[in-house]
Amino acid sequence: MPTVLLTGFEPFEDEPINPSWEAVRALDGERVGDAVIVARQLPCVFGAAIDAIGELLDTLRPALVIAVGQAGGRAEMSVERVAINVDDARIADNAGAQPIDTAIVADGPAAYFATLPIKAMVRDMRAAGVPASVSQTAGTFVCNHVFYGLMHRLARHPAGTVRGGFIHIPYLPEQAARHPGQPSLALETLVKGLRTAVATALSTRADVREQGGQLH
């Protein structure tokens, strides 16, 4: 039975919870078609997070990997297009590290694109009633760090054998209550969005060609 690996992060920056972990763990063990979802938590720590996802790739040998992270301030589920080879941390990670203008992989490519049908995923998430969009930046904190590390590792595999990408998600309502004016999505909406994204990624190899860009 094929495995779909979903990863979420531990809480960071004084948050008591991280919506990425709450959402992915709700799907742990669920079957989508003939595949089964396995959810695992990553540390919000530079270096250690890439090491952890690498170990999961070795032990689980998934057919599909979607890493998920918190993006407080965003109003939609953001399916990321590209990971860039730089750490530039506005805040320290959970181990106190704050790399500035540091390559994630020395002499690695400047960027990697997700190998998921990102526009088809957004289309189907919206059709399911979930606010979603294509995002052109995963930031320069641990989320982008993991996204780049994941894609660098998957680049070793024969093309198309293991596909991967990243989805950013908004705060949960209980977090937004601590950050007045910030948008949020209910946990059940986030779970529905991830379930839909997984189903589309499993069933769709070639992405749709439709508008998904931004002017700025």
From Swiss-Prot:
It is found in: Cytoplasm. Keywords: Cytoplasm, Hydrolase, Protease, Thiol protease. It is an enzyme of class 3 (hydrolase). Its EC number is 3.4.19.3. It catalyses: Release of an N-terminal pyroglutamyl group from a polypeptide, the second amino acid generally not being Pro. Its main location: cytoplasm. One of its GO terms (biological process) is proteolysis. Gene3D superfamilies: Peptidase C15, pyroglutamyl peptidase I-like (3.40.630.20). GO terms for molecular function: pyroglutamyl-peptidase activity. One of its GO terms (cellular component) is cytosol. The keyword Cell division does not apply. It holds the Pfam family Peptidase_C15. CDD domains: Peptidase_C15 (cd00501). The active site is at 80, 143, 168. Removes 5-oxoproline from various penultimate amino acid residues except L-proline. Belongs to the peptidase C15 family. Homotetramer. This is Pyrrolidone-carboxylate peptidase. It comes from Cupriavidus taiwanensis (strain DSM 17343 / BCRC 17206 / CCUG 44338 / CIP 107171 / LMG 19424 / R1) (Ralstonia taiwanensis (strain LMG 19424)). The lineage of its organism: Bacteria, Pseudomonadati, Pseudomonadota, Betaproteobacteria, Burkholderiales.
